[in-house]
Amino acid sequence: MSWDQVWIDVNLATMDPSVSAPYGAITNAAIAVKDGKIAWLGPRSELPAFDVLSIPVYRGKGGWITPGLIDAHTHLIFAGNRANEFELRLQGASYEDIARAGGGIISTVKACREADEAELFELGRQRLNALAKEGVTTVEIKSGYGLDTETELKILRVARELGKHHHVDVKTTFLGAHAIPPEYKDNSDSYVDLIINKMLPAVIAENLADAVDVFCENIAFNLEQTERVLSAAKAAGLEIKLHAEQLTNMGGSALAARLGAKSVDHIEYLDEAGVKALSESGTCAVLLPGAFYFLRETQKPPIDLLRQYGVPMVLASDFNPGSSPICSTLLMLNMGCTLFRLTPEEALTGLTLNAAKALGIEDTVGSLVVGKQADFCLWDIATPAQLAYSYGVNPCKDVVKNGKLVHQ
């Protein structure tokens, strides 16, 4: 056989639903790569003969290979920090209190409007490096810290540039409807007009976004405004997603499901009717335990109902300066289990196959299947559950991206 590389002495957590074992596991396995794709995988005993003198062979020393991790919800590009708000919350102020007083997202908006692209790029590069060291091979990055046309475009341009200069694939999301900017505080409908009539066409003209998101909440955009933005995005051929049911149940998830959204994110206050709507539309539920933890929330997402209705559950970092300043997907695995009572297998599925579904890329990444992109990680672990069980020492030993060894 003619391959570009072969990995032996490994166990595979394929996350392939067609493999009946937990995690889609194949033990005592091998995996071969050709032209950036998975060319063969299976038990080592069935590995076809190949020229060991001309093909690089990597020995995994009994470790586990998983698909590359996918962080499907981040706000990774921003300037400044909000440590002062952290102190205020510890003194009793709520997320809503801070937002209504002009803090929260708006304070980061000010910093991003003042920062240039070079500064934002370097900050984003450092954060993307941190995720990459934990085995992330694909990341979603949202805008939303500009809230004017110029700065929203600036953030999205930086995200696109990061994707061009980093081995991690970057999917971009336009989140102009993240908050009401101060200049539109008393006229939010006019800001929605600006998003639809000026921002969105400019984003599309430069091909800066793969999807459009809205923060549907009582401190942000109401249902009617949310539908206007998402409908305009859908009409323009972009994928849609939604921040919903984080602080209250406004029915945003049902709206998103009706419009065919790829995902609904946060969903702490999602009810059974909303879960049923997600199930019927095939919309993913993105769980963000970092924000739940950092905001010291008590209302948990309806995990049992999501299981009952078969809604794909995704885990993501929600990395951002205000509600989840936690740049770690491995910690999300642990939090998903300890805070939301996911099983370790559900948690890992949420950072691989289901995360790919939330981004609409499950045909190319998210599981180890012949023909899919060769994005995978070798972990120094005895069992896949160990990724969620223990945190603090990074067990990621090697990362292969598009068939190339990028971290060793």
Swiss-Prot record:
Residues binding 4-imidazolone-5-propanoate: R82, Y145, H178, Q246, S323
Location (main, coarse): cytoplasm
CC annotations in GO: cytoplasm
MF terms in GO: imidazolonepropionase activity; iron ion binding; zinc ion binding
Entry binding sites for Fe(3+): H73, H75, H243, D318
Binding site for N-formimidoyl-L-glutamate: Y145, N320, G322
EC category name: hydrolase
Reactions catalysed according to its record: 4-imidazolone-5-propanoate + H2O = N-formimidoyl-L-glutamate
Compartment(s): Cytoplasm
UniProt-listed Gene3D superfamilies: Metal-dependent hydrolases, Urease, subunit C, domain 1
Keywords from the named record: Cytoplasm, Histidine metabolism, Hydrolase, Iron, Metal-binding, Zinc
Entry's EC annotation: 3.5.2.7
Co-factor binding comment: Binds 1 zinc or iron ion per subunit.
Binding residues for Zn(2+): H73, H75, H243, D318
Database matches in InterPro entries: Amidohydro-rel (IPR006680), HutI (IPR005920), Metal-dep_hydrolase_composite (IPR011059), Metal_Hydrolase (IPR032466)
One biological process term in Gene Ontology: L-histidine catabolic process to glutamate and formamide
Cofactor(s) annotated in UniProt: Zn(2+); Fe(3+)
Pathways per UniProt: Amino-acid degradation; L-histidine degradation into L-glutamate; N-formimidoyl-L-glutamate from L-histidine: step 3/3
Annotated family: Belongs to the metallo-dependent hydrolases superfamily. HutI family.
PANTHER family on file: IMIDAZOLONEPROPIONASE, IMIDAZOLONEPROPIONASE-RELATED
Protein name: Imidazolonepropionase
Protein's organism: Shewanella putrefaciens (strain CN-32 / ATCC BAA-453)
UniProt lineage: Bacteria, Pseudomonadati, Pseudomonadota, Gammaproteobacteria, Alteromonadales
Name of encoding gene: hutI
